[in-house]
């Protein structure tokens, strides 16, 4: 715990000296394929993040939005949304629309939640370049925050599935996710 405090202090000091602000909107917006819907309604977000995203709740709406982004010079987008009770983004109905966006040259990142090999392969085949994967390192945090019966290894498995499918897998480690307490973050770094 003491070592973690030292590392956090050092990270804060460095961020004050070298922090660059990147504002992706409007050239790289976040799009929710579920609108404001999320079965998890977890303690991490409580559907709040979904409110700030553009909504494209059907494959047709998503395709139109992606084509508009392409025609207006956007770089790409983050594809996200609410999760099922199993911690998964219901992306399968949207894969053809995503492929169309990729064919138009959009660079897309997805926040898919937990994924199996087949889904990871389908996401990669749709032309997405990267996947952002939450990496909680404490099973109790996963249960308390997300309400999932999953463990850190399930997130590692998702990351490996996405990486092996050809996507750039980007781990997200949220410090203090467990109600502000630091639990499992160092473990997540070692996974």
Task: Identify the residue ranges that each predicted region occupies.
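Helix C-cap/helix->beta junction micro-motif
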Residues: 14-15, 104, 165
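Gly/Ala-rich phosphate-binding loop of Rossmann-like dinucleotide-binding domains
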Residues: 34, 102, 163
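Conserved strand-turn element in the central/C-terminal portion of the radical SAM core barrel
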Residues: 158-183
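Electropositive phosphate-/nucleotide-binding environments in soluble metabolic enzymes
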Residues: 2-5, 56-63, 152, 186
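N-terminal [4Fe-4S]-dependent radical SAM core
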Residues: 1-39, 43-54
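A general structural detector for well-ordered alpha-helical segments in enzyme core domains, enriched
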Residues: 62-65, 93-98, 119, 154-161, ...
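Core AdoMet radical
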Residues: 47-60, 69-92, 101-119, 123-156, ...
């Amino acid at each position: 715990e003491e070592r973690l405090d030292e590392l956090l202090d050092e990270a804060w000091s460095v961020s004050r000296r070298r922090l660059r602000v990147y504002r992706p909107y409007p050239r790289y917006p976040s799009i929710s394929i579920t609108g404001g819907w999320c079965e998890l309604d977890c303690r991490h977000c409580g559907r709040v993040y979904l409110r700030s995203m553009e909504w494209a709740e059907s494959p047709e709406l998503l395709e139109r939005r992606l084509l508009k982004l392409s025609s207006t010079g956007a770089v790409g987008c983050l594809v996200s949304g609410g999760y099922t009770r199993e911690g998964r983004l219901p992306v399968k109905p949207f894969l053809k629309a995503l492929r169309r966006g990729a064919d138009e040259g959009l660079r897309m990142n997805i926040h898919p939640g937990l994924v199996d090999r087949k889904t990871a392969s389908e996401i990669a085949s749709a032309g997405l370049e990267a996947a952002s994967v939450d990496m909680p390192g404490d099973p109790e945090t996963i249960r308390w925050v997300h309400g999932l019966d999953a463990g850190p290894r399930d997130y590692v498995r998702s990351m490996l599935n996405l990486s092996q499918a050809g996507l750039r897998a980007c781990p997200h480690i949220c410090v203090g996710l467990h109600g502000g307490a630091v639990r499992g973050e160092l473990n997540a770094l070692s996974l």
